[in-house]
Amino acid sequence: MKKSLIALAVLAASGAAMAQSSVTLFGIVDTNVAYVNKDAAGDSRYGLGTSGASTSRLGLRGTEDLGGGLKAGFWLEGEIFGDDGNASGFNFKRRSTVSLSGNFGEVRLGRDLVPTSQKLTSYDLFSATGIGPFMGFRNWAAGQGADDNGIRANNLISYYTPNFGGFNAGFGYAFDEKQTIGTADSVGRYIGGYVAYDNGPLSASLGLAQQKTAVGGLATDRDEITLGASYNFGVAKLSGLLQQTKFKRDIGGDIKTNSYMLGASAPVGGVGEVKLQYALYDQKAIDSKAHQITLGYVHNLSKRTALYGNLAFLKNKDASTLGLQAKGVYAGGVQAGESQTGVQVGIRHAF
């Protein structure tokens, strides 16, 4: 009898420990047929692509209840390509963080979305992916160089506050950790944050960030200010973004760009959603401007599976060479002043 009681106590203790911890395997497989009418050489491109409605991914995440409202967690997530498998070189560059959360909010350490991108890309109706999302967080203008930290950053420390009656904020700092002799100083460094108000149908956010990128081997400041807002009327949702980016260069002068986005989405029959979004990208110093219109529809077959279609049109003016992003098929620009049209039809499954 005594041995039985001891055995039951051990089982109960182990069950409680298991209940306090969890590990989840998750992912999305998103594959589509895509067509782009024109590349930089004037030729059309078509084929099987990936990440049209959501970025295809595979990951592990877990939490441990430490008691007193404190939780530890980890998140490892990498991109996958449903069109060709792309098994070689898999990594966790979408996110690789360890965290602590509680009544004070959440602290994360590791590679992650920078706070400004994490919050403000939520106003993009196409979730910063597919053939025609808002491209303001990328270095789209001539002379801006490589986009190091506009969306994600290595060596990032970030903090997200709890919600205070609708008000919330997030802040982050990424170390540059220069390790290679001869590289530009401070490249990779990020400092920025946002303040937001989310209450019922209304959401509004203001983000400020400075990143160190590299142009011609020289470190360059990328100063970014972004304002985003949305309002859900029930029958439709309106969303908008205003962004100004300034590159401070030692050689060649500063580059100033403005990006604007306005979109609307509406539910269809309880199982679908139609989306229409317009964006303008303007670099006045060299008379470079591009207009972008994207139309999309998502039809949910279940909570985890959906069919979708995207149609995008991009019109460059003057010196602009922007291009649509049909991942797995074509992701490049066109000749200056040329227009481009693209289509994606695909399926997305989450697990």
From Swiss-Prot:
Gene symbol of the encoding locus: omp32
GO cellular component: cell outer membrane; pore complex
Function (record text): Forms anion selective channels.
UniProt family annotation: To bacterial outer membrane proteins and porins.
Subunit structure: Homotrimer.
Highest taxon of the lineage: Bacteria
Protein name, as recorded: Outer membrane porin protein 32
Modified-residue entries (Pyrrolidone carboxylic acid), positions: 20
Bilayer topology: Multi-pass membrane protein
Family annotation (InterPro entries): Gram-neg_bact_OMP, Gram_neg_porin_domain, Porin_dom_sf, Porin_Neis
Signal peptide location: 1-19
Native organism: Delftia acidovorans (Pseudomonas acidovorans)
